[in-house]
């Protein structure tokens, strides 16, 4: 089972994204149905980013309306390889806490720690372009290059 980081979903959604080709090439290697997962956090992140003027402006596009963002998300789910993960895995919160604890404020750690914990406790391979995930021991990680 595969859990994609938001950066993969965004790269797949935006043809001008620096990681679009690598993400598309990876996606094209997957044939089995129902093996690529959104979790609720990556779903929300994608919807938020697709409606963000600054993010889409960097690609020369206006932000999507909320309706259009939902349609873009639904288009992913029309692909039988892609599904929304159901309930959070058992033990997720304890593992998330273990990954997120730091001695100083680290606001950027929350989402990465959550996704790493989701992957670890749910038995997912985490697919991302973000090398920061290498800090989380025990997770199965697939880093896609440019």
UniProtKB/Swiss-Prot annotation:
It holds the Pfam family PIN. It is found in: Secreted. The keyword 4Fe-4S does not apply. InterPro entries: Mtu_PIN, PIN-like_dom_sf, PIN_dom, VapC_family. Residues 3-142 form the PINc domain. Its cofactor is Mg(2+). It comes from the Bacteria. GO terms for cellular component: extracellular region. The keyword Hydrolase applies. Keywords: Hydrolase, Magnesium, Metal-binding, Nuclease, Secreted, Toxin-antitoxin system. Toxic component of a type II toxin-antitoxin (TA) system. An RNase. Upon expression in M.smegmatis inhibits colony formation. Its toxic effect is neutralized by coexpression with cognate antitoxin VapB41. This is Ribonuclease VapC41. It comes from Mycobacterium tuberculosis (strain ATCC 25618 / H37Rv). The lineage of its organism: Bacteria, Bacillati, Actinomycetota, Actinomycetes, Mycobacteriales.
